[in-house]
């Protein structure tokens, strides 16, 4: 299984969420609402989840092994950092320093 596309939208919120992503797996299956979170130990990817009636969050979809989780996290965070670099270049080109 390969992550064949990542669509990412940065968000400006008061909390720790930095972006929301959608990934495509093997050009055949899309997972929406993956969140990039700024945690205590750096950025990490949180899979889509739903709040249960007792207030807990349960994943709607998630990888079942660490190798797949790493592939997803690496692809999403690579795109997150790439977009950050593009925004910095656009900011500099606009004349701000």
From Swiss-Prot:
Superkingdom field: Bacteria
GO BP annotation list: asexual sporulation; division septum assembly; sporulation resulting in formation of a cellular spore
Keywords: Cell cycle, Cell division, Septation, Sporulation
Annotated family: Belongs to the SpoVG family.
Stored HAMAP family: SpoVG
Summary of the function given for this chain in its UniProt record: Essential for sporulation. Interferes with or is a negative regulator of the pathway leading to asymmetric septation.
Name of protein: Putative septation protein SpoVG
Organism for this UniProt entry: Bacillus cereus (strain ATCC 14579 / DSM 31 / CCUG 7414 / JCM 2152 / NBRC 15305 / NCIMB 9373 / NCTC 2599 / NRRL B-3711)
């Amino acid at each position: 299984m390969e992550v064949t596309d990542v669509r990412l939208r940065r968000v400006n919120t008061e909390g720790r969420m930095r972006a929301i992503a959608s990934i495509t797996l093997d050009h055949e299956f899309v997972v929406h609402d993956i969140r990039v979170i700024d945690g205590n130990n750096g950025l990490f990817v949180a899979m889509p989840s739903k709040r249960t009636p007792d207030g807990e969050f349960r994943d709607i979809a998630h990888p079942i092994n660490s190798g797949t989780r790493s592939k997803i996290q690496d692809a999403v965070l690579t795109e997150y950092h790439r977009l950050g670099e593009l925004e910095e270049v656009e900011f500099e080109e606009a004349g701000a320093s």
